[in-house]
């Protein structure tokens, strides 16, 4: 409910640029101020790249890296506040897991995550350093998610990756647009 104080706040961060890092810090400070006493978890790329910095932000309790993000509930099992946040991260070279995701953007558009990480180390991008090397789920699981999106009335499917599986999911005739 609007106006109520949260017991738990989860901040999923970005870290493409220094400005993104600054906005993440501002969002964390704002949440801590708006919800005093709440258990604060910070995850995402900024948390993966700079866990020590994030853990030192006043009010942060737990910092979860890319590999730990999908285990959020496990880390919420012990909601004890500490003077300084605890950081749980995995070196990006050791990140192996892939957490599938198919989210609804609006009434008929779905976004299908088919890849995480990246093997292209572009000079301007932090994704390989924050999310690790490229990895994906099975084609069968992605096709199943696309089928579920179509069954739920999806008319458009946008894949989120740097490679393409469009040919595998295009067999769902009820999808008008797949990109």
Give, region by region, the residue ranges found by the protein language model.
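Glycine-centered secondary-structure boundary/capping sites
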Residues: 82, 171-173
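Proteins enriched for Cys/Gly/acidic motifs involved in redox and nucleic-acid/cofactor modification
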Residues: 1-160
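Alpha-helix-loop-beta-strand connector modules within alpha/beta enzyme cores
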Residues: 174-179
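Conserved radical SAM core fold
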Residues: 162-171
């Amino acid at each position: 409910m609007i106006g109520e104080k949260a017991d738990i706040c989860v901040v999923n961060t970005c870290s493409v640029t220094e400005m993104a890092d600054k906005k993440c810090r501002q969002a964390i400070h704002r949440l801590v101020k708006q919800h005093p006493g709440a258990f604060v978890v910070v995850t995402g790329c900024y948390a993966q790249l700079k866990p020590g910095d994030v853990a030192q932000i006043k009010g942060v309790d737990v910092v979860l890296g890319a590999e730990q993000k999908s285990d959020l509930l496990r880390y919420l099992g012990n909601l004890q506040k500490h003077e300084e946040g605890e950081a749980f991260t995995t070196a990006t070279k050791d990140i192996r897991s892939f957490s599938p995701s198919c989210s609804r953007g609006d009434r008929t558009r779905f976004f299908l995550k088919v890849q995480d990480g990246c093997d292209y180390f572009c000079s301007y991008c932090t994704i390989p350093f924050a999310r690790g090397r490229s990895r994906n789920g099975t084609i069968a699981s992605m096709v199943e998610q696309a089928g579920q999106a179509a069954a739920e009335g999806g008319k458009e499917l946008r894949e989120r990756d740097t490679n393409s599986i469009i040919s595998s999911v295009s067999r769902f005739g009820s999808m008008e647009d797949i990109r």
